[in-house]
Amino acid sequence: MARTATQASPRLIALALPGIPGSVTVARRHVRETLGLHGMGEIAQDAAIITSELVANAVQHACGNGAARIGVTLTAAGNPAAVTVVVSDSCPQGPDRRETPADGEQGRGLQIVEALSVHWGWWYEDGGKAVFAVLAREV
């Protein structure tokens, strides 16, 4: 997915949140409620889980002391059959999708994002990065 496709799409929500653990809950709730209000409830749960994982990664890996901000954008990507979740933060280091042992308690976030989305990726943005995931919906 090209960055321009996301920018040209109708934005459903745009949030600026503090880099603290409580932002995970706020972002997840907004995404779920927004998709429900726009008649896209069938993907609301998956989008909320993806949002939780991406925001949690931003809080844990990019925000350190909580001073940084996290951006969350939800768009109807170019056609009615897709929705894109984008989470941006101030850390330029790209996400590290790693294999986690079966008994591991952490490190599965990007595996979950990959499993629930059509595709995902990231780009550099304003000294940080943006991580996106595209969800397909039945229309």
Where are these regions (language model features)?
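Conserved beta-strand-loop-beta-strand hairpin that lines the nucleotide-binding pocket
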Residues: 1-14, 59-139
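Short, structured helix-loop boundary elements
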Residues: 21-24, 44, 110
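Histidine-centered phosphotransfer motif of kinases
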Residues: 46-64
